[in-house]
Regions:
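Generic structural marker for isolated residues within well-ordered, non-membrane alpha-helices
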Residues: 95, 266, 312
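Short amphipathic alpha-helices in soluble, non-transmembrane regions
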Residues: 36-40, 192-196, 307-311
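Generic non-transmembrane alpha-helix signal with a bias for helix starts/N-cap capping motifs
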Residues: 33, 91, 263, 308-309
Length: 331
């Protein structure tokens, strides 16, 4: 267990914003989890759980508490199709491991930044797959009850980019130590999600093995999304919008695409509002994918907040819809 003091939050998050954290503790073993929490408790400091920082925004005032960095590694088979993966593993490394074993279930989650421990928190998903489709349970440390617990999928209240881990009274209560998933030997078959289907048709792909799907998804994602080491970004910055039937009909009458489940792609809204490539207070809307906000020159959270509010206002005036931020704020 490594304890560091006065650490720059911008060096822990991919948007590269944020002041100082009082303490940052790197967790390398399961035993470190309880020790680190007790350290925070003894110092009467709040705790924030962080993985790679790809879905977290730091604030200018920093964090006067303890950031716990989950770096606990390990992947093991429980049986032929069931895997336990430790929370500090990179999600993409887990996807690579499973596709090499020709197992299906998470191959479309390739190239999503972040850790295994963060996957259930956000119920991460892409190209028609979501972690809840394969998730069985998580092993976690309950910061409130100060004990290790196993939480089954049906008790996680999983939804679109949400769970008990980031919503409601239990948000931030659990540090996910490991995740158990159950995969399959079945493979995905066409038709696929729009951009993946277009790729298949353009390149006349006939191999739909997990490894092949992973290769396609990775190429598509990196053709659109900035790599964190090259550009400061949190990936998709706005959530897609879900509507009731009446609102969905209103949007259809405006020739706005409404997908299955009355989902409206926020990227389309931003693009068709003419915001692609536009800069606001040092933040730029990506030319390749309108959902992406890139930190070009913003030096503070205040700049990001101003940019976000201006984009949200433009979309509200044009479509009557309110965009919601996807990354959580460190506070």
């Amino acid at each position: 267990m490594k304890i560091n003091e006065n650490v720059k939050i911008k060096e822990l998050t991919t948007m590269r914003l944020g002041g100082l954290a009082r303490y940052v503790i790197e967790l390398e073993t399961v035993e470190d989890v309880e020790k680190a929490y007790l350290f925070a408790k003894e110092h009467q400091l709040p705790v924030f759980i962080l993985g790679t920082g790809s879905n977290v925004i730091g604030k200018d005032e920093g964090f006067k508490g303890v950031i716990l960095l989950n770096r606990i590694k390990g992947i093991r088979f429980i049986d032929e199709l069931t895997i336990d993966a430790m929370g500090g593993e990179l999600l993409d490394d887990l996807v690579a491991f499973t596709t090499e074993k020709n197992l299906s279930g998470i191959e479309a989650l390739s190239a999503i930044p972040g850790t295994v421990g963060a996957a259930p928190v956000q119920n991460v998903g892409a190209y028609g797959q979501e972690i809840e489709q394969v998730l069985e349970s998580v092993h976690a440390y309950d910061l409130k009850e100060e004990k290790y617990v196993t939480i089954k999928k049906e008790d996680m209240n999983l939804g679109y980019r949400q769970s008990i881990f980031n919503q409601g009274k239990d948000a931030g209560r659990y540090l996910i130590i490991s995740m158990r998933i159950h995969l399959s030997h079945d493979t995905l078959t066409p038709p696929f999600y729009t951009s993946l289907q277009s790729y298949v048709e353009k390149h006349q792909i006939t191999d739909f093995s997990p490894k092949s799907i992973r290769e396609m998804v990775t190429e598509i994602r990196w053709s659109k999304l900035p790599k964190p080491e090259e550009m400061a970004s949190s990936g998709s910055f706005f959530k897609n919008v879900y509507l009731d039937d009446q609102e969905a009909e209103r949007l259809r009458s405006m020739n706005v695409p409404v997908w299955e489940g009355n989902k409206v792609p926020s990227g389309w809204l931003i693009d068709h509002a003419g915001l692609k490539g536009k800069s606001f207070y040092g933040m730029r809307v990506s030319e390749k994918a309108a959902l992406i906000l890139i930190n070009e020159s913003a030096q503070s959270y205040a700049h990001l907040k101003q940019a976000r509010e201006e984009i949200v206002s433009i979309i509200e005036k044009k479509y009557g819809l309110t965009l919601k931020q996807e990354p959580v704020e460190l506070e």
